[in-house]
Amino acid sequence: MSLPKLHVAVLMGGWSSERPVSLMSGEGVAKALESKGHQVTRIDMDRDVALRLAEAKPDVVFNALHGTPGEDGSIQGLMDIMGLTYTHSGLVTSVIAIDKELTKQALVPHGIPMPGGRMVKTADLYKADPLPRPYVLKPVNEGSSVGVAIVTAEGNYGSPISAASKGPWQEFDQLLAEPFIRGRELTTAVIGDRALLVTELRPKSGFYDFDAKYTEGMTDHICPAEIPDEITEACKDIALRAHRLLGCKGTSRSDFRWDDEQGVEGLFLLEVNTQPGMTPLSLVPEQARALGMDYSDLVEAIIAEALKDAGKA
């Protein structure tokens, strides 16, 4: 893929819990663009971001932010007001996709299989279990498994849950409780209007948490996943349908849990990530690489999608 030489502002950092990941993603993107001869302005997201974007006057903004405010519609709304062309999804899609409950409301009526569950106030956890054990607790709008916990039948956080157990959810006021789905972690990337591959993730710690995601050697990535063809095709179909239904742009990544004793009936979409990581260990670059697309070409492909959507390509 060949792009004209562009001035690209790379937005990274910010103040969410995923700041370290965003900085790694952003620096990787910036170096890739420079290797292709593009002019790059690095912007570490802060409260003066509008001024810095206005001063930079970029041809396009590469959004390498993760979490709030780069993934929840905030920065997208600002860039819309400023008339900037930017990568990845727009305001409405971002608002919906970062909220796991809103995502369910948008996708389940269209036949996308997602786990059941319910919203629960953190304070109510210490009164009674919201679901039969085992179940999963997760913040409604965090990524990278921040704040996620599996509550086991053995009472790993007490029975009932004890505030003294210092669960990772305690800094959040509201949580989503979902039934725990035994089985395997799968993920599928979409670029443009094409689902790539399916990767199976096998964390050596048993849980695919923040450290397992971003520490080299802590998770085995099997790409393409060694799973039945019908599961591969189901993952790709669901990922592409979810991408389209939510109105995602550029790239997205759909994460699944698969109970391999249940066949295709055991496959559930957990979430759609509209700002998937672009670090050396990240899954979208890995799948692209397995299909013969190197990292710098992937970055340019994402920018090309943004230019096309803006009518500039």
UniProtKB/Swiss-Prot annotation:
It is an enzyme of class 6 (ligase). The keyword Secreted does not apply. The keyword Metal-binding applies. GO terms for cellular component: cytoplasm. Pathway: Cell wall biogenesis; peptidoglycan biosynthesis. Signal peptide: none annotated. It comes from the Bacteria. Mg(2+) 2 binds at E271, N273. Its EC number is 6.3.2.4. It is found in: Cytoplasm. ATP binds at residues 130-187. InterPro entries: ATP-grasp, ATP_grasp_subdomain_1, D-Ala_lig_Van_CS, D_ala_D_ala, Dala_Dala_lig_C, Dala_Dala_lig_N, PreATP-grasp_dom_sf. Residues 104-304 form the ATP-grasp domain. Binds 2 magnesium or manganese ions per subunit. Its cofactor is Mg(2+); Mn(2+). It catalyses: 2 D-alanine + ATP = D-alanyl-D-alanine + ADP + phosphate + H(+). Keywords: ATP-binding, Cell shape, Cell wall biogenesis/degradation, Cytoplasm, Ligase, Magnesium, Manganese, Metal-binding, Nucleotide-binding, Peptidoglycan synthesis. GO terms for molecular function: ATP binding; D-alanine-D-alanine ligase activity; metal ion binding. Belongs to the D-alanine--D-alanine ligase family. Cell wall formation. HAMAP family: Dala_Dala_lig (MF_00047). This is D-alanine--D-alanine ligase. It comes from Novosphingobium aromaticivorans (strain ATCC 700278 / DSM 12444 / CCUG 56034 / CIP 105152 / NBRC 16084 / F199).
